């Protein structure tokens, strides 16, 4: 998908179009995992926009459990990218007005949460879109 913003001059500006083509959505995370298969050893399927936002933000399960929103990242051990991201989303930051990042995101639209989630992931590695999903390469 493409993202846009309106600048201070009131001009619509194309911001980004780095995305996975098409994407396949599933009703449940289990259905998505069955279709995608194993994320790899010491890895987990990570939702760029968190699963809890189905309830917190009223987002569709087809958008959340979608190949556009899932990426395989290191997980299962202390200090993994997955544990660092989970910790960050549970933390309170200066911009969250006393809320956790997770709560602060609640109610924001999918595209806003998606761009935020990508930026969080990109602190730990590079995200490359393919025709079938994202590839995450962790910084060494």
Question: What role is predicted for each listed range?
Answer:
Residues 1-21:
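Autoprocessing domains of the Hint superfamily
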Residues 17-140:
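Catalytic toxin/effector domains delivered as secreted proteins or via bacterial secretion systems
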């Amino acid at each position: 998908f493409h993202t846009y913003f309106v600048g201070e001059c009131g001009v619509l500006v194309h911001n980004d179009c780095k995305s996975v083509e098409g994407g396949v959505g599933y009703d449940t995370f289990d259905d998505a995992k069955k279709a995608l298969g194993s994320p790899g050893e010491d890895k987990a399927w990570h939702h760029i926009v968190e699963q809890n936002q189905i309830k917190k933000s009223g987002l569709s399960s087809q958008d959340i459990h979608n190949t556009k929103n899932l990426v395989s990242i290191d997980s299962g051990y202390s200090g993994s990218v997955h544990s660092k991201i989970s910790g960050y989303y549970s933390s309170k930051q200066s911009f969250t007005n006393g809320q956790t990042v997770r709560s602060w995101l609640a109610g924001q639209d999918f595209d806003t949460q998606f761009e935020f989630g990508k930026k969080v992931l990109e602190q730990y590695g590079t995200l490359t879109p393919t025709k079938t999903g994202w590839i995450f390469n962790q910084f060494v």
